[in-house]
Amino acid sequence: RKGQIGVLMSRKMIPTGITIEHIPERATLDITSAPRRLQVWIEVKDSDERARVEAERRVICEGESVGKNFVCIGTVEYEKNEFNHVQTFPINAAGTVTSKAVVRVWSNWGQEYTCLYRLRLHGEDKGPR
């Protein structure tokens, strides 16, 4: 594992996508710090809801959970050789409302460290936290 970042959102949402941005390959001498495989986890406090999300998702995440009440809802792979260095991926939260998310960088393209230039979580607004 290369790192993770937690997000405490100001509003509840149903996550629907994630955008990863890194410096373009054509603008750097070394692209190997770009993330490669990432996981998206959300907090689901209710145990019945957590079980439902786990049953409905079609995702297998590597490693241990990021926390007691978290479930993995997506894995994505950032492609360092793509012309577009801003890449958006759909994720399926199975309609679950959350206000906490964690993005785990599971691997990168070879460097000892990983750089994330911008990370955006997209979703359906469900009101104040």
Predicted regions and their residues:
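Structural beta-strand segments of beta-rich domains
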Residues: 3-5, 14-15
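A short beta-strand element within beta-rich, extracytoplasmic domains
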Residues: 11-28, 103
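Trp- and acidic/polar-enriched beta-sheet ligand-binding modules for extracellular glycan
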Residues: 1-4, 26-129
